[in-house]
């Protein structure tokens, strides 16, 4: 919310607290300010768990069963009590999955009464070749549901990034959302600020839901999601300095540190592939044969042995993955580098998950010699390796192996899989 204020976007009064005492003190400061400026009127507060996930209001905290990551409080003391129930606990919502997200901070904000809720987003649109404004006079709930039930209420306005957002088009868009009079001017100020933020901070998405009209005539951004282009990290140091790694998938954090293209998924078959296209095709063929990938991992063409080891470490630590499909088409990426990385990982980190290995291309035969040389070496006894040259057969084999390992785990049995 602070970054929005820097662009003259109106938001509720707020403070972020890391302890229950700090939250209570911030609420007291709010109350003192409001009483002094509102003729003695008391104020209510809203406490929101700060986790990177939606659905907080309907979530629950795993450790104490406390219901709701968004709570209305009537006094600073209640703010402190509620914050204590949230901080340090794991909030589970529909978007977090059963693992949940740890709440390290809470947002304390004023409570206000909403007259109308709107939806506004700015995205990069491929078909428009630039930014596009998307809005609806119906906000406050899932935009997907709104688009399904009331498609006519969704308004889109492409923006020429070279010309920017003109005042005329800005007022036209705000009018489509149902703003008029003084509120139209206030809405234009917010939307203009959102666009300037989008451009100047290298955003790929800004979603505001809701943008509200309050009973006292204000227009406020109440909740927002912002995505920033990772490629702009070098010039948006202030933004990326706020990155909270505790809210991210630890697998993706480790991959980022090793300069690997990795996206964690929920399946049981770990994937290590070179090239994004082949990686997606590998995931597709796993699905085709009834399996489910545990990740997207593109080691690219320039990965070295160290990166291969780091990639396998990530898969080794992933409890979801019970086998690995390594699918390499050697061009710039040499097959022997993959083989040496696999061998080193077996020795250094005791990599012991079954590996279905498919290698084609540059130095394929050299890779086979590397693997043949360690076949009877007890130092590599943990390595469960199955080699298959055919892409389709390799995928089928990986799905079968994952199924066997899963069944064995459910029966509390240990299995060791190796080639005949």
Question: Language-model segments: what does each one mean?
Answer:
Residues 333:
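Short glycine-rich, flexible loops that bind phosphorylated cofactors or substrates
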Residues 329-330:
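A generic structural motif
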Residues 352-360:
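Short internal beta-strands
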Residues 1-208, 212-326, 336-348, 360-362, ...:
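ATP-dependent carboxylate/acyl-activation modules
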């Amino acid at each position: 919310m602070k970054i929005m204020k820097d662009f003259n976007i109106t938001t509720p009064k707020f403070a972020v607290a890391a302890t229950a005492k700090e939250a209570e003190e911030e609420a007291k400061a709010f109350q003192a300010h409001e009483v002094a400026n509102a003729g003695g009127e008391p104020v209510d507060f809203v406490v929101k768990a700060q986790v990177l996930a939606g659905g907080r209001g309907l979530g629950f905290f795993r450790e104490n069963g406390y219901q709701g990551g968004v709570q209305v409080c009537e006094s600073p003391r209640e703010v402190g009590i509620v914050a204590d129930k949230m901080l340090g606990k794991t909030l589970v919502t529909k978007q977090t999955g059963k693992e949940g997200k740890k709440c390290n901070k809470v947002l304390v904000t004023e409570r206000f009464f909403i007259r109308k809720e709107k939806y506004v987003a700015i995205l990069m649109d491929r078909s428009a070749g630039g930014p596009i404004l998307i809005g609806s006079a119906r906000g406050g709930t899932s935009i997907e549901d709104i688009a399904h039930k009331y498609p006519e209420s969704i308004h889109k306005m492409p923006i020429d990034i070279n010309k920017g957002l003109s005042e005329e088009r800005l007022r036209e868009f705000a009018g489509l959302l149902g703003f008029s009079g003084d509120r139209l001017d206030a809405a234009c100020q917010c939307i203009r600020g959102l666009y300037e933020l989008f451009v100047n901070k290298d955003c790929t998405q800004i979603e505001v839901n809701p943008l509200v009209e309050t009973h006292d005539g204000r227009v406020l951004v109440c909740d927002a999601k912002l995505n920033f282009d990772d490629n702009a990290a070098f010039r948006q140091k202030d933004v990326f300095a706020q990155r909270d790694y505790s809210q991210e998938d630890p697998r993706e954090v480790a991959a980022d540190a090793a300069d690997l293209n990795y996206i964690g998924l929920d399946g049981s078959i770990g994937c290590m592939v070179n090239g994004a296209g082949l990686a997606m095709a590998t995931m597709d063929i796993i699905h085709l044969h009834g399996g489910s990938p545990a990740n997207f991992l593109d080691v690219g063409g320039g990965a070295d042995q160290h990166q291969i080891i780091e990639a396998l470490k990530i898969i080794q630590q992933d409890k979801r993955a019970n086998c690995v499909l390594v699918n390499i088409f050697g061009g710039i990426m040499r097959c022997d580098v993959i083989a040496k990385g696999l061998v080193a990982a077996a020795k250094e980190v005791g990599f012991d998950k079954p590996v279905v290995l498919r290698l084609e291309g540059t130095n394929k035969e050299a890779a086979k010699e590397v693997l043949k040389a360690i076949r009877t070496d007890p130092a590599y006894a943990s390595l469960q390796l199955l080699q298959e040259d055919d892409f389709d057969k390799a995928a089928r084999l990986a799905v079968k192996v994952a199924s066997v390992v899963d069944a064995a785990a459910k029966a509390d049995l240990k299995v060791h899989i190796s080639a005949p």
